[in-house]
Every structure is written in structure tokens, then in C-alpha cells.
Amino acid sequence: MDIKSVAVLGAGAVGSYIIQGLANKPGITLGVVATGERAQRLGQGCKINNKIYHPQVWSPKEAHNVDLLVVALKYGALAGALEDIKTIAGENTTVISLMNGVDSEETIASVIGPEKMLYSLIKIASHKEQDEYVFDLESTIGIILGEPQAPFDSIRVKAIEKLFAETNIHYRVTEHIREEIWSKFRLNVTNNLPQAILGAGIGCYRDSQHMKFISKALRHELESIALAKGIDMSLAKKALGTGVSVPPSARYSTLQDL
């Protein structure tokens, strides 16, 4: 199995990471899925890290039966995009969802079938400057993916490894993808949400004992919920530091969106 065509649904920060990584991959047809005014705007190019990329722009029907569909939407947009995803996903399509939360795979599988879903997540720090998405490629942890059950070294996992090989897309394969997804969800809940409510930089977790308490309490509650669902987050690989200093004023994605 070789992946020759890739469609990206959602050309924000996450979609931009995929676009810039695959734009110059030999033998790959790359497109973004959009309609109406958004399609016209994307047709003018995607500005990423001070460079403009020009992936093809496809309607959902034009993207039908691509080899790989990357869903990179904001979570609130998923419900409204399910019909488009259903249109795009053909008999030979593999779908990965790089969305926050813990149930996007199940939601998408409800309309296209679970056999088309390959579980995944992404860890990326980015920000937007006017019409441009900016991120540090070297420090980006990238995509974590895996089959939810054996065989973990499936044909499609190997195909995606081959797709990402010799690109600047960082990735790793895991046998504990559900635990990894919940582990990222834990980070989002315990770090993103308190900061977003107060509008404070990430230095608040170092400077305020009250913020530390709130974060730890949320962590405990989320871990209790996960265990009740049979998710053992101790199986998730601990993220390695990138060595990049983060200023106390830095904002996680939730606060950036607000």
C-alpha cells in the first residue's frame, strides 16, 4: 500500500504543518478541501513560516477516495463537517484526526465506519501572525499515531511512515494510542483551560500556588475518569523536552483562540 494522494480538511495551524511537510514530497498529490469563499481564499495560497504554499483546492466530491484524509478542524466544526468527510472517504481511504479531545475518531467512525480510522494526535506549538501560521519545526513534537488494537505494524501504519519519511514532519508510532490521546487531553485540560479562564501566561503555574492547585485538581479528576473508562495513562510515553525556552507570557492554543 502506497499513499499517493492526501487531502487536508482544515487549513489552520495543524493543517499547515501537514501542508508544508508534504508540499514537496515527490509523487504525492496534495490538496485542501474547501468550498465557497474559503476555497477562493485558499486558492491564493497558504502562508506558512514566511513561505506561500499552493496545494490544490478540492471540493469534497473532488477529494473522494483519496488515499489519506487528514482531519485538522477545530472540534466545534466537526459535527458540521461529517457529511463532507463521508463524501471524501472512499473504499480505499484512511482517515486520521488530528483534533483535540478524546472522541473525534468515534464521531467520524460513526459515519464512515471504524475500519477507515487510524488513531492519532498532534503536539505542536504555533501562533498566527495576520494571515500566516508560524511554528518552530525543530521543536515540534509532531504526530503520534497507531492502531487501536493489534496488529500494530499494519500495512497502513507502514504506508504513513513511508509517506512522512524524508519530510520535516515529526512522528512516532505507538501501541498505546488511546492512552496517548487521553494523555494529551489531560495536558489540554490541566494547562490550557485554567490559563484561558484567567487570561494569564503560562508563568502563572510557576508563580501562583492557587493555579498549581487548580491544575493538579483537574489532573486528578481527569485521571479518575480515564481509569473508569479503562484508560491507563501511565502507558503513554512521557514527552521529552525540546530544550526551547518558553517565556512566562506564552499562551496555549485555547487562550490564543479566545
Named regions from a protein language model:
Residues 32, 56-59, 145:
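Generic preference for hydrophobic
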Residues 230-258:
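C-terminal active-site/capping subdomain that shapes the small-molecule cofactor and substrate pocket
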Residues 18, 87-88, 111-116, 133-239:
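Internal alpha-helical scaffold of NAD(P)-dependent oxidoreductase catalytic cores
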Residues 49-134:
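Rossmann-like NAD(P)(H) cofactor-binding subdomain of soluble oxidoreductases
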Residues 1-54:
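NAD(P)+-binding Rossmann beta1-loop-alpha1 motif at the extreme N-terminus of oxidoreductases
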Residues 3-4, 67, 141:
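Nucleotide donor/acceptor-binding cores
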Residues 36-37, 102, 121-126, 149, ...:
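Glycine-rich beta-alpha junction loops
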Residues 7, 29-31, 96, 118, ...:
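A structural signal for isolated positions on well-ordered beta-strands in alpha/beta enzyme cores
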